Design a protein with these regions (language model features):
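Basic, low-complexity segments
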Residues: 1-45
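Hydrophobic alpha-helical segments, principally membrane-spanning helices and signal/leader peptides
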Residues: 5, 37, 54, 77, ...
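Helix-centered, glycine/charged polyanion-binding patches within enzymatic domains
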Residues: 2-7, 194-267, 275
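Polybasic low-complexity intrinsically disordered regions
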Residues: 41-57, 65-71, 75, 79, ...
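Sequence-level motif detector for i,i+2 pairs with an aromatic at +2
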Residues: 3, 23, 113-115, 253
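Acidic, contiguous segments within the catalytic cores of piggyBac-derived transposases
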Residues: 16, 23-35, 233, 242-258, ...
Length: 314
């Protein structure tokens, strides 16, 4: 089959969105300036916080977007304030490190309405370990630490609807219920790979009245009648010899957009976390998701192709 050829129909708009990703005013906007310092009355005794949660979130987002250390991010933002002649100061790097353990970072967009297809997958973010070249030449060391980033993506808009970070030993199916409960929007169907073919995942989808598009594992048997979606998926390869027809009729192949989301994460922000405390790593990951959603909202390519499908954008 010939390689697909795509034609972007909104190239001027998308090109401008790509350029704006490098603009500091795109990430450091008027909303952040106005709410930089904490103005709310403290609810408990002790020294009040000087910087708002939005200020800490902004520092973490800029750190991820420009791939800076906390100290470098502090110097970078302070220099921007100085050049703009804005009477603000960046939080000290130690303050950001401490506040990251408790800050609540919101990554959800104001989009509303029904989601036709929600696609789910996970990827690993490295905390400690050598690079691939060293592993290739000398083998891997014993100590390699990873975290798992779980994402649920709207296949139409590419927006990340739900996100969670877990330890490496947490399976995809174990993280699924907590992930899907993050949204109360109506979802028509949810697609995931065979790792999610467990009763735990199917029960959660049935509870939320979501059609399950999960291919059964090899040698899978039928479940009780209430699992009709899964039983149809089990029956199809037995009748046709493969899952190809089931994937085509259910539009399961849109799940590849979850792989696109993982690719965008690694290409735009790197595949590692730098904060050492686990709660801080959660905040760093959510800042990454917030930045990705902001890029998505700013502009995505619209395309046409002879064979149909979506352009693998970043």
């Amino acid at each position: 089959m010939a390689k697909q050829k795509f034609k972007i129909t909104n190239w001027p708009t998308y090109n401008k969105a790509l350029i704006n990703r490098g603009s500091i005013t795109f990430w450091l906007d008027d909303e952040a300036f106005q709410a930089w310092y904490e103005s709310a009355t403290p609810s408990s005794r002790g020294r009040p916080q000087r910087y708002s949660d939005l200020a800490i979130t902004t520092v973490l987002v800029i750190k991820r977007v420009f791939r800076l250390t906390l100290r470098a991010a502090q110097g970078f933002i302070d220099s921007i304030f100085s050049l703009m002649n804005v009477p603000l100061r960046c939080p000290d790097y130690s303050c950001v490190s401490r506040r990251a353990k408790s800050v609540n970072i919101s990554f959800k967009t104001p989009t509303r309405g029904e989601i036709a297809h929600l696609v789910i997958d996970s990827t690993g973010l490295k905390v400690f370990g050598e690079g691939e070249w060293k592993v290739k030449k000398h083998g891997q060391e014993r100590r390699r630490i990873w975290r798992k980033l779980h994402l649920a993506v709207d296949s139409k808009t590419h927006e990340i609807i739900c996100a969670d970070l877990s330890l490496n030993n947490v399976t995809d199916s174990e993280a699924f219920p907590g992930l899907i409960r993050q949204t109360h929007r109506k979802i028509r169907s949810a697609a995931a790979d065979g790792a999610y073919d467990t009763r735990l995942c199917h029960d959660e989808l049935r509870r939320k009245k979501i059609s399950a598009l999960i291919p059964p594992r090899k040698g899978a048997g039928y479940w009780p009648g209430e699992y009709a979606d899964r039983n149809r998926a089990v029956a199809n390869p037995r009748m046709t010899g493969s899952n190809a027809r089931w994937k085509w009729t259910t539009d399961y192949n849109r799940r590849s957009i979850a792989e696109t989301a993982m690719y965008r994460v690694k290409q735009l922000f790197g595949g590692s976390l730098t904060l050492r405390d686990y709660d801080g790593q959660v905040a760093e990951a959510m800042a990454l998701v917030r930045a990705l959603n902001k890029m998505t909202k700013a502009g995505m390519p619209e395309n046409t192709t002879r064979y149909g499908g979506d352009l693998p954008e970043i």
